[in-house]
């Protein structure tokens, strides 16, 4: 005789998360990490941008509750991702803001929510001479924090990217130039000819693969162009790098890098200068985080430089006021 299927339980299920914990201590962040999602963001008059993204989603938790309702986090992420596909959200940092706001609605006990998104973005590029098409992976970071108030939530958001490029060391290049100058003088070459030669053919130096990071934090109503951030990162190193290079391309890339030697410090300062000119419409309290890591070729260590400041602080320093502390 076949066994009758069990009927689903129709009674009220216990809400264990809502019970009181044994230790009544507030928790700063409770949530889920590494939630992998496919993100599609529509753009006006352009193809949609598709990201493979990892989300970290948190809420704060009062000491009176044993646990947070984590399933609500997944529901909110999926709802906002659908809004992005439908065109209601058209920037990835706004996507994080939308998730953070909805989390406050769903977690009525929370006063603070936080959403982080780490993505990889494929950028199509052309090599400088042969114009061969290749692709580059750019790491994209977005974050939003929402805080409950008696009125509307206060939301701060940030958008950033990490780009790989090439740097040429100015120190070693000047050492090599001084040596070459001495040799050429010994061969009877006049200084004017020597200077003309160096202007066309820069001296050799050791190189680094550089990783630049730039992130801008603003209020929720401000717009920060991700493509402009990526462009600033690329232009702040000695030269770009490519997955595929023909011989002519390789010559052009190496020449460009050696004509534009930069220390790791130079890269960070150049980024800061370009941010001030490229995002001059942002308020002075916008926070900029700039990092550069150069993987040395003739040393066993990496070179590193960093700056974190408001736009107002950077502008004051560029204008000659160096009293602001880093």
Curated annotation (Swiss-Prot):
The protein's matches in InterPro entries, at most eight in alphabetical order, are given as: GTP_cyclohydrolase_FolE2/MptA, GTP_cyclohydrolase_MptA
Catalysed reactions listed for this entry:
GTP + H2O = 7,8-dihydroneopterin 2',3'-cyclic phosphate + formate + diphosphate + H(+)
State the disulfide connectivity.
none
Q: Which cofactor does it need?
A: Fe(2+)
The protein's enzyme class: hydrolase
Keyword tags: Hydrolase, Iron, Metal-binding
Q: How the cofactor binds, per note?
A: Binds 1 Fe(2+) ion per subunit.
Q: Give site residues, May be catalytically important.
A: 169
EC number(s) recorded for this UniProt protein: 3.5.4.39
Q: Which Pfam families match?
A: GCHY-1
Pathway of action:
Cofactor biosynthesis; 5,6,7,8-tetrahydromethanopterin biosynthesis
Q: What is a GO molecular function of this protein?
A: GTP cyclohydrolase IV activity
In which domain of life is the source organism classified? Archaea
Q: Name the Gene Ontology biological process terms.
A: tetrahydromethanopterin biosynthetic process
The record's family statement is: Belongs to the GTP cyclohydrolase IV family.
What biological function has been recorded for the protein in this entry? Converts GTP to 7,8-dihydro-D-neopterin 2',3'-cyclic phosphate, the first intermediate in the biosynthesis of coenzyme methanopterin.
Q: Which PANTHER family match?
A: GTP CYCLOHYDROLASE MPTA
Q: How does it assemble?
A: Homodimer.
Report what the protein is called.
GTP cyclohydrolase MptA
State the encoding gene: mptA
């Amino acid at each position: 005789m076949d066994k009758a299927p069990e009927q689903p339980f129709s009674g009220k299920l216990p809400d264990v998360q809502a019970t009181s914990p044994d230790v009544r201590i507030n928790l700063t962040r409770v949530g889920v990490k590494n939630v992998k999602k496919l993100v599609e963001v529509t753009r006006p008059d352009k193809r949609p941008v598709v990201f493979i993204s990892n989300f970290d989603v948190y809420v704060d938790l009062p000491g009176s509750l044993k646990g947070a309702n984590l399933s609500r986090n997944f529901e909110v992420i999926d709802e906002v991702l659908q809004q992005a596909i439908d065109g209601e959200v058209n920037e990835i940092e706004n996507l994080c803001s939308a998730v953070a706001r909805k989390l406050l609605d769903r977690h009525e006990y929370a006063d603070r929510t936080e959403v982080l998104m780490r993505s990889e973005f494929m950028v199509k590029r052309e090599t400088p001479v042969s114009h061969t098409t290749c692709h580059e992976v750019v790491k994209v970071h977005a974050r939003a924090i929402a805080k409950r108030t008696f009125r509307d939530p206060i939301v701060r958001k940030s958008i950033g990217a990490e780009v790989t490029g090439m740097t040429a060391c100015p120190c070693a290049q000047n050492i090599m130039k001084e040596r070459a100058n001495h040799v050429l003088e010994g061969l009877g070459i006049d200084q004017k000819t020597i200077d003309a030669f160096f202007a066309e053919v820069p001296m050799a130096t050791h190189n680094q693969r550089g990783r630049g990071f730039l992130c801008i934090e603003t209020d929720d109503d401000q717009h920060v162009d991700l493509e402009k951030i990526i462009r600033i990162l690329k232009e702040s190193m000695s030269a770009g790098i490519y997955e595929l290079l023909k011989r002519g391309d390789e010559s052009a890339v190496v020449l460009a890098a050696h004509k534009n030697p930069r220390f790791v410090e130079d890269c960070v300062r150049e980024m800061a200068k370009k941010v001030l000119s490229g995002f001059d419409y942002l308020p002075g309290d916008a926070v900029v985080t700039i990092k550069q890591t150069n993987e040395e070729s003739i040393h066993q260590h990496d070179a590193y430089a960093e700056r974190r400041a408001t736009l107002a602080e950077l502008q004051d320093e560029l204008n000659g006021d160096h009293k602001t502390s880093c």
